[in-house]
């Protein structure tokens, strides 16, 4: 029975197949004439098409099944994705854009999660922007930057947060062209409860900033997506693929961010394509100008266009695929449309002066600090006569007015600048004369014979020096200089000596008051040096008339007494007696006046301290460190002062006194510091008046050859003989090593050893003194960890092994801070700058570890590493261990001061062995531990072989 049913079933199946093929044959015949192939739609494909229809991803099937030649269905697909299946009735042949037959294509189907939509790198940004709105209120705000821009996200609790304000202060007006050249766009998030907000800062090709407010509802989504921690400041740098390239828990300098970006291979292509971009951007003149924009949906894609470009972009996208040049031409033509309204300009112009003023202030600061970093130190030779530094006349009057108080008011009336030629010709005179300064205040007292001889010798030589140079110097010399030794005496001065000795002169020209005219002042100044010079001759001339007057007075007295005795009884001679009495009184007055003039001069105060007296108080007792500096704020002096103040105890055990002379040669002040032990009696060598005595200071300068206005330092032994000259600041360790070789010091050390005198640093070292030890001399690499068993800390230590030479040549000092709570400590590792592998280690006390962590705001709870430059500023933060020091070396070698060091080291042949990086260094780092650095690291190999060490 079953075998009979088999043929019937086969017959029915064959008939069904024939009928089915007959119904489709007309469609096949009609399509065969046109040469068009009809896609076979299977039940499986129809199901997938239905699935795509629901998910909105049916672009691949729709292309192969569209019917109309016009782009009308293409527009409909933008709004509502529709799936069209093949119909047997009407099939006109579709053509491409230029009449080319369209080839069907099938696209892979994937799930469209929110995270994959952000990282979708297969489809173009244009298609992605059609599917998702990308305005500042859209949840897909990051999608507008994908493939075109790098995104710099700054997250802070609120706008007044300290780190946020510090980071924004680093964003000066002149940095936005650099940011635009690297295709960087900014997103600022404020996430504190109740103050959620933010803004999107788009940087145009002209450096202009277009700010759009950010929807507060997007803040939590962006925070969770970027894994940003609430309540703390943090920054994230995203690649063009929207992958995280670097995280920064603290503000960093833009150079560190540029360094990270410039390491990528795509950045090299950008540099080639954008040559001269920064110059053109800055030439536009609108760099740093902020334009406030509203919240628009289509404003997300125009990353570097103007506001008009962003608003006009969606209508353009509904058309056929544009070429690369078309949007740019339209952008330039449409950018002028939002310009006519004056309101944006009125709102954006007021902030501009504020920002420029801030930038100017910061520049002044940097220029003032820069000479310390780029000072080319002079050679060790001492050209005594040629090193005459010019000094400004306008800076002298205030200091001179303080020192020479008697002449201050009158001298200040004669302020006039010297001509440049005259000033240059007078420099040798100005540096030679102060050494011969005499006490011009001794016109009321008779000075010792030694001073008479010196002043007479000065006057004797000046009589024959009335040449062109002396005339010029007398007419144009700085009026604030000490008048005594500087004014040469003219040949007519001896004729004025009688006038100088008279009482009328002293009455008219009171030294405590200023004179009425400039001519009288010059006459008074000229008379003072000649007075001291001629005192001996004056006294001799005075003695002769005094003796004659005395003889006449005695004879007159005798005659008058005889007459009074003989004619006492005669009344007619009373008138004669009265006349004689009057004559007696007159004679007595003249005798008293003549006798009082020399005695008054002898009763004047004693002369001021001389150089011999000053040095005599130090001889055999103290060693001297004499320093001259133009001003107290001089950078070289500040370095040297900080250096010896840190070694107080060592200075005291070596019995060193520091004599510091401030100011120019002709107007200086002095300060003396004695470093003594506790059991020594405090020393007081000079009075306060002697510290501003120009004669004493000039003689001290002359004694040790410190006769020019520059930093200079002299070291003496206890015999006060010069042992060493220094023209630049020097480390006190080398000074102490030199002193310990003195014979007198060897005896002192033996004596101190017997008495048990040792250096005990009982004072707690302050943070300022600790950091000033490294300023402009060393770079600090600070590593902080909760304990020495921390995994990140141990990984970082393994990366530091074998890097002593590189650290030394780059002047790096490692500071390790360990511990939490009260159990904290630290170690300071000093590497020699010559590249040797010897490391000096010093313990850091607990209180200093806490101060350093507080100063740099480093948490003791987790690992952290930061690089501090020679200027004391933090250059970069590293929240995770650096398995290779390449990034740190690249950052340091890009600094200007480091380039100067490299040039010096190259000339000296200082370099590190090439095999130092074997195992993990430059050549193996490109296998890397991070996806962002796996691109290409050949530039590290070129760095290794290209630099001289």
From Swiss-Prot:
Belongs to the CCDC80 family. Residues 436-445 have a biased composition (Polar residues). This is Coiled-coil domain-containing protein 80. It comes from the Eukaryota. Glycans are attached at residue 467. GO terms for cellular component: basement membrane; extracellular matrix; extracellular region; interstitial matrix. Phosphorylated. Residues 1-22 form the signal peptide. The lineage of its organism: Eukaryota, Metazoa, Chordata, Craniata, Vertebrata. Residues 345-380 have a biased composition (Low complexity). Residues 554-587 form a coiled coil. Residues 24-79, 112-132, 289-610 are annotated as: Disordered. Promotes cell adhesion and matrix assembly. Keywords: Coiled coil, Extracellular matrix, Glycoprotein, Isopeptide bond, Phosphoprotein, Secreted, Signal, Ubl conjugation. The gene is Ccdc80.
């Amino acid at each position: 029975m079953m075998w009979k049913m088999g043929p019937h079933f086969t017959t029915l199946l064959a008939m069904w197949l024939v009928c089915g093929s007959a119904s489709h044959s007309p469609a096949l015949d009609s399509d065969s004439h046109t040469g068009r192939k009809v896609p076979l739609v299977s039940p499986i494909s129809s199901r997938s098409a239905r699935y795509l229809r629901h998910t909105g991803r049916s672009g691949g099937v729709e292309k192969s099944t569209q019917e109309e030649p016009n782009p009308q269905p293409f527009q409909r697909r933008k709004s509502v994705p529709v799936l069209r299946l093949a119909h047997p009735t009407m099939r006109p042949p579709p053509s491409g854009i230029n009449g080319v037959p369209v080839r069907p294509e099938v696209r892979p189907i994937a799930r469209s999660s929110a995270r994959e939509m952000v990282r979708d790198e297969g489809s173009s940004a244009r298609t992605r922007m059609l599917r998702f709105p990308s305005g500042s209120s859209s949840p897909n705000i990051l999608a507008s930057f994908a493939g075109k821009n790098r995104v710099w996200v700054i997250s802070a609790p609120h706008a007044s947060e300290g780190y946020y304000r510090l980071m924004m202060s680093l964003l000066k007006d002149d940095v936005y062209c650099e940011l635009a050249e690297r295709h960087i766009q900014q997103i600022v998030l404020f996430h504190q409860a109740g103050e959620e907000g933010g803004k999107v800062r788009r940087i145009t090709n002209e450096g202009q900033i277009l700010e759009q407010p950010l929807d507060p509802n997007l803040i939590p989504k962006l925070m969770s997506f970027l894994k940003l921690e609430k309540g703390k400041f943090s920054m994230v740098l995203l690649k063009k693929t929207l992958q995280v390239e670097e995280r920064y828990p603290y503000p960093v300098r833009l150079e560190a961010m540029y360094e990270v970006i410039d390491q990528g291979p795509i950045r090299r292509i950008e540099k080639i394509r954008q040559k001269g971009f920064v110059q053109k951007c800055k030439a536009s003149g609108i760099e740093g100008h902020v334009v406030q924009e509203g919240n628009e949906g289509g404003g997300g894609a125009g990353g570097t266009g103007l506001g008009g470009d962003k608003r006009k972009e969606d209508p353009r996208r509904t058309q056929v695929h544009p070429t690369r040049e078309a949007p740019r031409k339209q952008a330039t033509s449409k950018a002028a449309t939002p310009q006519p309204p004056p309101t944006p300009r009125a709102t954006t112009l007021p902030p501009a002066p504020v920002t420029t003023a801030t930038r100017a202030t910061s520049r002044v600061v940097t220029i003032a600090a820069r000479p310390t970093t780029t000072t080319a130190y002079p050679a060790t030779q001492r050209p005594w006569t040629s090193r005459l530094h010019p000094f400004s006349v306008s800076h002298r009057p205030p200091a001179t007015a303080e020192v020479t108080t008697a002449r201050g008011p009158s001298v200040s009336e004669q302020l006039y600048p010297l001509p440049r030629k005259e000033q240059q010709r007078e420099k040798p005179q100005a540096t030679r004369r102060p050494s011969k300064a005499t006490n011009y205040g001794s016109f009321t007292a008779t000075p010792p014979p030694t001073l008479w001889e010196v002043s007479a010798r000065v006057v004797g030589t000046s009589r024959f020096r009335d040449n062109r140079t002396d005339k010029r110097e007398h007419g144009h010399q700085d009026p604030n200089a000490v008048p005594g030794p500087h004014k040469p005496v003219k040949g007519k001065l001896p004729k004025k000596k009688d006038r100088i000795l008279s009482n009328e002169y002293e009455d008219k020209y009171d030294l405590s008051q200023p004179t009425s005219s400039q001519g009288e002042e010059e006459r008074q100044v000229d008379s003072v040096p000649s007075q001291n010079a001629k005192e001996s001759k004056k006294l001799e001339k005075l003695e002769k008339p005094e003796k004659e007057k005395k003889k006449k007075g005695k004879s007159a007295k005798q005659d008058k007494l005889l007459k009074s005795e003989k004619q006492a009884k005669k009344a007619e001679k009373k008138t004669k007696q009265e006349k004689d009495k009057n004559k007696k009184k007159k004679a007595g007055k003249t005798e008293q006046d003549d006798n009082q003039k020399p005695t008054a001069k002898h009763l004047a105060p004693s002369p001021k301290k001389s150089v011999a007296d000053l040095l005599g108080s130090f001889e055999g007792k103290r060693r001297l460190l004499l320093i001259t500096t133009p001003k107290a704020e001089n950078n070289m002096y500040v370095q040297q002062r900080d250096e010896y103040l840190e070694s107080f105890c060592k200075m005291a055990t070596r019995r060193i006194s520091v004599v510091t002379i401030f100011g120019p040669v002709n107007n200086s002040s002095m300060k003396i510091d004695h470093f003594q032990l506790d059991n020594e009696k405090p020393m007081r060598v000079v009075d306060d008046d002697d510290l501003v005595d120009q004669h004493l200071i000039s003689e001290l300068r002359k004694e040790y050859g410190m006769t020019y206005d520059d930093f200079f330092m002299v070291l003496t032994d206890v015999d006060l003989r010069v042992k060493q000259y220094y023209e630049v600041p020097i480390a006190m360790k080398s000074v102490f090593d030199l002193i310990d070789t003195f014979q007198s010091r060897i005896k002192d050390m033996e004596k101190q050893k017997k008495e048990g005198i040792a250096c005990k640093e009982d004072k707690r070292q302050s943070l300022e003194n600790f950091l000033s030890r490294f300023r402009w001399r060393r770079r600090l690499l600070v590593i902080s960890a909760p304990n020495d068993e921390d995994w990140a800390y141990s990984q970082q230590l393994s990366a530091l092994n074998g890097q002593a030479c590189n650290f030394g040549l780059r002047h790096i000092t490692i500071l390790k801070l360990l511990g939490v709570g009260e159990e904290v400590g630290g170690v300071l590792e000093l590497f020699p700058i010559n590249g040797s592998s010897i490391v000096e280690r010093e313990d850091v006390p607990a209180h200093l570890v806490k101060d350093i962590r507080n100063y740099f705001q480093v948490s003791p709870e987790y690992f952290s590493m930061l690089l501090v430059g020679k200027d004391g500023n933090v250059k970069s933060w590293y929240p995770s261990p650096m398995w290779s020091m390449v990034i740190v070396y690249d950052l340091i070698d890009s600094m200007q001061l480091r380039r100067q060091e490299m040039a010096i080291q190259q000339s000296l042949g200082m370099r590190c062995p090439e095999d130092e990086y074997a195992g993990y260094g430059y050549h193996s780092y490109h296998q890397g531990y991070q996806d962002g650095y796996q691109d290409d690291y050949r530039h590290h190999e070129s760095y290794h072989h290209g630099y001289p060490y």
